[in-house]
A protein has these predicted regions:
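Conserved alpha/beta enzyme-core scaffold
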Residues: 1-498
Length: 498
């Protein structure tokens, strides 16, 4: 079936063209914004056509703005031909990651909730073209988003030209799942009238001026979501420790939950399926497989996010029972899903993943050994600075014990000790609220560090207190010595340690 039946604005029927023709609107040096937040709802046909132009010898270096990470047809295809001069605001693909760390692509790592407003303010440059995936186009030109919303509403508003990919692999049952609202910019912004997870304040479509539309492109390529690893024993242990803490401190009724992207976050949500909790509500960015488990178990009343982000199997599961799941789900622009005002008002329990933590509660979420970018801060900072309970989870050790995730000092700080409330590892929980740094360290060492690293951390902490003292004892000549040792020997353990 063609896309004509999905285009209700008859003037736009004349704009139907091929991906190759549409791609000609993309020129060297342009700022391009696309739909997509994780590998869901991103354009596929036009980006592939752009990459083909470069493969044939044309020079294209572009600034690429999205909601977050996107699929292989965009990030990876463009990175492979080195077409991305600058990337905003998050990424997960192997090739784009290599380009960033090699210096071929400049990467602006920004809190996800702030990007749309900064674009409207003009800080990120003038957007030349927006490429947006649609389920269908309404009579007024409004676009029904598919499996993510991200920054698309603002991109459509700000771009000089718009290319719409109507994706027939996305079911029409997605119509009505989104709630699109663009807030006024400060200082004219009013309070956002959301006091519960399932409240709606906008429209089901993204406004778009039909006069901006230069091409409407058919596409039938499905979302290529990423597999989730099987839930391992470390992740199960973290989930058990956290749920036990919640049961003790919150009782039977929890405030809305926020859960980050990835295997650990999915494992924690999966752990709630086996708990006694009912009537759960989730206000988050991404909706992964465990959310469907909670809905099926009758434990999740409502979930708000900006994107679906399930495994390939989870996505097919969603499509099979789409009417059941969509009744519980609302997708919003990321400046709403990650909004500081709403996170503070709802008193969220925010659960996100750390690369490493230090004995004082600082968290590194982005850079291995302080240097190599992994994915980006994403939305974790939006929630860590505003949630009612801020939780960071990480295994106590990695690489068969060669790396401790609890270190004397993190090599890069994304979330400071001032906002981190709870650290959870497979070893236990450290509740840091109301504590001096010198009170936090013993809790983190004893409750969260791997057993083989506890004596080493105690040795560092005790010597730091004795040698330099102060409010935040730190041995400057040893703070990163564990990382140096790993680079030199392949383990953070000193020679002769078990």
């Amino acid at each position: 079936m063609g896309i004509e039946s999905r285009i209700f604005n008859k003037e736009l029927l004349s704009k139907i063209t091929t991906a190759e023709e549409a791609a000609k609107h993309i020129k060297d040096g342009m700022v391009v914004g696309t739909s997509g937040f994780t590998p869901c709802g991103y354009p596929k046909a036009v980006p592939l056509a752009v990459a083909e132009r470069v493969k044939k010898g044309e020079k294209l270096r572009l600034s690429l703005l999205t909601g977050a990470s996107v699929g292989v047809e965009l990030d990876e295809a463009w990175a492979e031909v080195n077409a991305i001069a600058k990337r905003f605001p998050y990424q997960t693909g192997k090739k784009i990651n290599q380009r960033i760390n090699a210096g071929d692509t400049m990467f602006f790592d920004i809190h996800l909730s702030q990007m749309a407003q900064q674009l409207r303010y003009g800080f990120l440059g003038k957007m030349d073209v927006a490429i947006v995936e649609a389920v269908c186009i309404l009579e007024n030109g409004g676009i029904i988003p598919s499996t993510s919303v991200g920054n698309s509403p603002t991109f459509l508003q700000q771009a000089e030209k718009v290319i719409i990919e109507v994706n027939t692999s996305q079911p029409m049952e997605l119509v009505g799942m989104s709630d699109i609202f663009i807030p006024a910019d400060p200082p004219a912004r009013h309070p956002l009238p959301i006091t519960d997870v399932n409240q709606r304040i906008g429209t089901i479509y993204m406004p778009c001026d039909p006069r901006k539309v230069v091409a409407v492109v058919p596409c039938d390529i499905g979302d290529k979501t990423r597999p989730l690893a099987p839930i391992d024993e470390q992740s199960k242990a973290m989930a058990r420790h956290l749920i036990k803490f919640l049961e003790k401190n919150y009782g039977a009724v929890l405030p809305p939950l926020q859960s980050g992207v990835g295997n650990v976050a999915n494992a924690v949500m999966a752990g709630l399926v086996e708990s006694d909790y009912k009537n759960l509500r989730v206000w988050t960015e991404v909706i992964q497989d465990a959310m469907f488990d909670l809905i099926d178990a009758g434990k999740l009343n409502a979930v708000s996010g900006t994107s679906l982000s399930p495994s390939p199997e989870g996505l097919q599961r969603f499509y099979r029972d789409i009417m059941k799941y969509r009744d519980k789900i609302v997708l919003r622009p990321q400046e709403i899903s990650n909004n500081a005002e709403i996170a503070r008002r709802l008193g969220l329990i925010a659960m996100n993943t750390a690369l490493e933590v230090d004995i004082y509660g600082n968290v590194n979420s982005t850079h291995t050994f302080g240097t190599t970018m992994v994915n980006g801060i994403g939305g974790s900072g939006d929630f860590s600075r505003n949630a009612g309970l801020v939780v960071f989870l990480t295994p106590a050790a990695a690489k068969k014990g060669a790396i401790s995730r609890v270190v004397p000092h993190v090599t890069h700080t994304d979330h400071t000790e001032h906002e981190v409330h709870l650290i959870v590892t497979d070893q236990g929980v450290a509740d840091l609220r109301g504590l001096d740094p010198k009170e936090k360290a013993p809790l983190i060492i004893e409750n969260c560090a791997a057993p083989e690293y506890r004596p080493l951390l105690w040795d560092y902490f005790n010597r730091a207190k004795k040698k330099v003292g102060g409010h935040h004892p730190m041995l400057l000549d040893e703070a990163f010595s564990w990382h140096v040792r790993f680079n030199e020997t392949g383990t953070m353990k000193p020679e002769g340690a078990a």
